[in-house]
């Protein structure tokens, strides 16, 4: 006998062990001969990571697809792996060294530090894989890959060297997001936009040689200037005074009448003494600030573009740690006359932290009478998400990928339908990014990662090869072939050769996303032409979140199309479908964050409710394009769904239900059995179609309704008289049919609730028997039995009883009270149905009499079923006066709440200023109250008529 309650804590490890021992998830498990492949590569979690709700949703959806296709007999590979997570991992290990009072990274040196990282990875990395197994992820764990393992490192070298030799990777000086704390370039994804309360400082920049102009200070009603003042300066507004040391221009809008007369003139930059031009550029907004913008090309992304358009110099005035560097800065000093009067200011600023320098610069402007005003100003400041400090746009030499060239085939692939996004609207995000794509900075100033395969000769000449030996050969050929100052030097070094004397390797490593971009084919063995690569590439679907479309999806498309070709040499997409899931938010629709204290830990949910309940909740809430609002109460509710199935299996077992391997749906004779078999076929068809179209919420919702409503609430309830009756043949058929339907339910539910269904599958094998296969390796249900007449008859019965029950509930009829039913307008077919199902109607609808009538009794509740009206006279069932008073009171309460909500929603300030989630919740509540009010008023009308 099945245990009384399902204990997820004991069942889940047992089932996981059974899967593991059976190699149930290996590539090709359960594949039929000649089966087509189905491949998914897991978005590789960081080696430092632990399971969060985003992982739980992402991997639940992948696992549903993988288990579904494996049961359909496809040759399935779900490829697992981890990302080396450059910055995150380096920070973790550095923190560990500090906690253990060991020498820091720089003290121990690069080689020793990298060894420490590998040691940490062996001891502590990969925790998330065990957590994914707890969730039930059915990856082929024997094929686990890591972005720093030997095979993937070979792929990275191959791609870098190839792209470099195709002029698609190059080194150049451009602006990057620079983290002064970590002292490395970081990607846009590692930048967090944080709103801060700051200031807008208005500085006066004096015009050169006493040049003046008339500046409007008063205007008439039409905006025409009526009063002017003569100025020998221009006012610029900035939130970052410390960058003014690197200003090389002032921009005004070419249509701005205030400044047209001084475009082309120059100002003398205070503190610095540099003469810089006033230029006309559309970037300057006449309505913002003073309309004049200081241009610092080396410290602002927009200014960098203005500088390129207007031919302005880019002068970097900061060190890599964000301190000021001017006194020995050749770029800064170029063209300056070094007046002694400025040296004092330079001394005050040299070496200061950028924010300290900000205060000093404001003081100097104020002392010189050049501080026009200070305005409080809320604005967004980009911060490094790891270092936690404001990032600094920094002009620096880095390695870049020519994204624009690589983007063209990837744009065409989606536009021509070879790769499709689901939901389709995400294609707009993809195109928007691709069509405005910028060069990709791929170098990072870290030690943990793929070191860039570039070596420099004594004159700075770069040699890019896979190995130092190959780079050395290229260098020798280069220097020996060219008559020049370095030829003799190289020849001399070769005579007494020592490694590292001729070439010096680039110290930078590659952006983590570089190796991740190769994930779909590098994990299958590329650049080797392995059997796995031939078999499982391209992959079928990528399941991922929308936030990494630009950083990962785009780059996998670019690299896949560039490096993977079919037999005819045509580019091959890495996946045919990209399924984009939404965010998991808290129950109020707020994004989860530690600062808000609303982070939900999936492992805690698994501990409390079981993995199946969490998985089913995520699936049923994963409507395309709609964020998941996760309330633990919902998980408790779907745990109850599992309990319902568990109890249904126990009930069936107690009533002699056991599998009959010889049962055939076509041989069922009872209408009730033919009905459930028809509904089973409909359910299997609809669930299959929903999963094929990535409608996870529809698939799980269909299963929920079939299992809870049709099978448990109706089928088993209607079978009770059969199980307790004298007709042994009907009993045997129903027992076999119920067992068959339960087995099909386990199969259909398995992708969503794998642990419980696997346990039930094993338990219901039969006394003393074992299943031939694990449930995860059985065939997906494809029942075809249909009996529309039987389905129509039982669904008619369900509609009738449900209608009566609803009317009784609405009218507050005591649960134990029995009532007469009067049926008006029934045809002969309905009359026959009423006769056949009279016993069930009496039992389930609490009816003591069913009779025909010509008209509906006054004041009766009326239920339309087909052509007939079933009437429930109320006079003898309820205290009409008390019920009328109850309903009027309830209507009053609902009216009052509706009035409160209407006042709120009609308040423009509330709608404009309240959180969108709060406004949406009020609107949802109003819609609920509308329905409730209509129901109460209908009930009141019935009571009034009955009285």
UniProtKB/Swiss-Prot annotation:
A motif ('HIGH' region) lies at residues 45-55. The keyword Cytoplasm applies. The keyword Oxidoreductase does not apply. One of its GO terms (biological process) is valyl-tRNA aminoacylation. Residues 879-943 form a coiled coil. Keywords: Aminoacyl-tRNA synthetase, ATP-binding, Coiled coil, Cytoplasm, Ligase, Nucleotide-binding, Protein biosynthesis. InterPro entries: aa-tRNA-synth_I_CS (IPR001412), aa-tRNA-synth_Ia (IPR002300), Anticodon_Ia_Val (IPR033705), M/V/L/I-tRNA-synth_anticd-bd (IPR013155), Rossmann-like_a/b/a_fold (IPR014729), tRNA-bd_arm (IPR010978), tRNAsynth_Ia_anticodon-bd (IPR009080), Val-tRNA_synth_C_sf (IPR037118). GO terms for molecular function: aminoacyl-tRNA deacylase activity; ATP binding; valine-tRNA ligase activity. Gene3D superfamilies: HUPs, Isoleucyl-tRNA Synthetase, Domain 1, Valyl-tRNA synthetase, C-terminal domain, Valyl/Leucyl/Isoleucyl-tRNA synthetase, editing domain. ATP binds at residue 594. Pfam families: Anticodon_1, tRNA-synt_1, Val_tRNA-synt_C. Its EC number is 6.1.1.9. GO terms for cellular component: cytosol. It is found in: Cytoplasm. Monomer. ValRS has two distinct active sites: one for aminoacylation and one for editing. The misactivated threonine is translocated from the active site to the editing site. This is Valine--tRNA ligase. It comes from Agrobacterium fabrum (strain C58 / ATCC 33970).
